[in-house]
Amino acid sequence: MKNGGGNRVAVVGTGFVGSSYAFALMNQGIADEIVLIDANENKAKGDAMDLNHGKVFAPNPTNIWYGDYHDCRDADLVVICAGANQKPGETRLDLVDKNIAIFRSIVESVMASGFQGLFLVATNPVDILTYATWKFSGLPYERVIGSGTILDTARFRFLLGEYFDIAPTNVHAYIIGEHGDTELPVWSQADIGGVPIRKLIESKGEQAREELERIFVNVRDAAYQIIEKKGATYYGIAMGLARVTRAILHNENAILTVSAYLDGLYGERDVYIGVPAVINRHGIREVIELELDDNEQKWFQHSAATLKGVLARSFAQ
């Protein structure tokens, strides 16, 4: 991180997610400087112009411009949103081969600038590409973060809030594991106002359990539904990225479900995967190890094994 002065965020990739993220940063007044970098220079120029025209309405002054990888040298945070998009019918893991080569070029270019900050990865499959960013950058793993299951957890809390007619900010529940088809809900640790969700429904019988299972399925499959309807997801993840950015730049020590490196916790090693972690200006201060029940532990192991299988194929030497 820079000593003194304002903070700088470099956004690599100004497609739907990158431009929505920059918009969220400006609207919330999170960053002092935002530099937009894209292979399509005109797109980055256009986004910078468009965002600058709204500065008069922003809560805080923000310096926004289009730039190149040299601008990453003084960045506190580089957020990678570039890569091939998920198409209808594709899983996130289908994008691996398309995006690893792209990431090698991006990360090597960022590091060549003299960058000494943190990486935040948004591109799918995010757990795999966060691992790739760590490998290609040579940075300590706590300084490389993926968006993980932050959006899945937000979707989960939103739908549970609707079901129980409670503000989603008062629903405490996590989705962990792969940001994708093998993710899992941690029902054993889910509560509203300190009351376990399982206890809230125990008098309602099998129907309530089935309704909660449908809520999880809708969380897991939300991206497929949105992509089928509008071609891409970007607003929700942009706000999730802004939340992680705020935790970093404001040194919040906030607990967020990000893609973090495991080195023994949850019984797993050498994998980036979605888990609750404490986030501050140094990156991941620590990973929170939830107490999972037996079924959740087996499910999590399956999710980690799925990611490790992809990593083994992608990084075989």
Swiss-Prot record:
Any one Gene Ontology molecular-function term assigned to this protein's record: L-lactate dehydrogenase activity
Protein's name in the database: L-lactate dehydrogenase
Principal location listed in the UniProt entry: cytoplasm
Annotated positions of the Phosphotyrosine modification: Y224
Assembly notes: Homotetramer.
Domain of life where this protein originates: Bacteria
HAMAP family: Lactate_dehydrog
InterPro entries (UniProt xref): L-lactate/malate_DH, L-lactate_DH, L-lactate_DH_AS, Lactate/malate_DH_C, Lactate/malate_DH_N, Lactate_DH/Glyco_Ohase_4_C, NAD(P)-bd_dom_sf
GO cellular component labels: cytoplasm
Pfam family, one: Ldh_1_C
Regulation of this protein's activity per its record: Allosterically activated by fructose 1,6-bisphosphate (FBP).
Species classification: Bacteria, Bacillati, Bacillota, Bacilli, Bacillales
Keyword Cytoplasm carried by entry: yes
E.C. number: 1.1.1.27
